[in-house]
Amino acid sequence: MPLFGAHMSAAGGVSNAIRDIVEIGGEVLQLFTANQRQWTPKAPSAADVEAFRRRRAAFGGPVFSHASYLINIANGDGAASAKAVEALVREFERCTALGVDAVVLHPGAHLGAGRGAGILRAARNIDEVFDRCGGQTPALLLENTAGQGTCLGGGLNDLAEIIDASRHASQLGVCLDTAHAFGAGYALHTDEGYRRCMEDIEYGPGLAAVRLFHVNDSLVPCGSRKDRHTHIGEGQLGEAAFVRLLNDPVFAMHPMVLETPKEDGHAADRRNLATLRRLAGR
């Protein structure tokens, strides 16, 4: 069966995210390692890093970081591009200190320069990040998008082309978000739509490249090019889409993280985790 978890807040210290994922019964954690709304956020203190590593050892599950939404790795503007690279380097440094397994990153927007130019710029900027970090670094997982505006990643081949264009392809992978895929036009709630999505993965980045799922239902219709998450089974995707994914033997042991609303805090996460486990036949 897949491993189920959630994105948890690191308010009050990153080690609190580990505490909270254990408290809700999660098996995998995603978090922001610093304030994702700031370009130069404060890094976790040495004491918090130590507490995180101690709790993480007891937790035992995979841990992923989500890079700041401010980072546009496909930006071709010199100053903006350098700022994005610097922010991702700092993210890698924090994740290395914490022992995080991989960083999730949106592939960015080409801002009118064109898809091809954006893909090449994303690959070059990613290469610069790995070149600067050197040695042992977390993996970098490119997340698909709903394809809004000039964002890359609506088509899964965008991710494949970024990976292929990078000198560090062996350190890159894919995070597949169900709500984003649905918004981009993959009808995951139907047999044919699910098959098409899996074929695009297989003949694009490759099934082995998928290392993480964001499991989110969608408030908006298939192909809307919008990104609006809701609780599992309560949106346009519906429970049938998740039954199909959660019971696909190809992804039997994959980590799957909720990014669903938390209007009543941890209670919402517990309900969504229970729904996922029920749909997976646990």
UniProtKB/Swiss-Prot annotation:
Single GO molecular function: phosphoric diester hydrolase activity
Reactions catalysed: Endonucleolytic cleavage to 5'-phosphooligonucleotide end-products
Residues holding Zn(2+) 1: H66, H106, E143
Pfam families reported for this sequence: AP_endonuc_2 (PF01261)
CDD domains recorded: AP2Ec (cd00019)
Transmembrane region(s): none
DNA damage keyword on record: yes
InterPro entries: AP_endonuc_2, AP_endonuc_F2_Zn_BS, Xyl_isomerase-like_sf, Xyl_isomerase-like_TIM-brl
Keyword flag RNA-binding: no
GO BP: any one term: base-excision repair
EC id: 3.1.21.2
Co-factor binding comment: Binds 3 Zn(2+) ions.
Residues given in the record as Zn(2+) 3 binding sites: H180, D227, H229
Binding site for Zn(2+) 2: E143, D177, H214, E259
Similarity comment: family membership: Belongs to the AP endonuclease 2 family.
NCBIfam families reported in the protein's UniProt record: nfo
Stored PANTHER family: APURINIC-APYRIMIDINIC ENDONUCLEASE (PTHR21445:SF0), ENDONUCLEASE IV ENDODEOXYRIBONUCLEASE IV (PTHR21445)
Protein name: Probable endonuclease 4
Lineage: Bacteria, Pseudomonadati, Thermodesulfobacteriota, Desulfovibrionia, Desulfovibrionales
